[in-house]
Amino acid sequence: AYPDEEVICITGEGSIQMCIQELSTCLQYGLPIKIINLNNAALGMVKQWQDMQYGGRHSSSTYENSLPDFVALTESYGHVGIKVSKFDELESAMKECISLKDKLVFLDVDVDPNEHVYPMLVAPNGSMKDMWISKNTKV
């Protein structure tokens, strides 16, 4: 839609795996997008629901050492992959990512698997009037 604009995709390892084959499309068309993969080794939203509503009983929401090496996978498509394992590595990795204007760059950023994201809509109805705004606050 905007070929002259910088495109940054912020995603998680669950969602990126649903369309990881598009790395081939990006190579074919020379699309220099930046992908920031927030990797918590889980289907984050599902795991968070299970933590909050089912006492932390996790069913089919964690990967338990079964994820691919996203850097190697990205590089196998001919793109640039960067692994960020520590918070103090993030700023320099982001600067490198943005500086590579003509390359697709995949930042695989490890995040705490126990960190939750808010606000969070509450199942089963998911109404905007029924959400968690913090671990202990539901509105």
Describe the residue ranges of each PLM region.
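Thiamine diphosphate
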Residues: 1-139
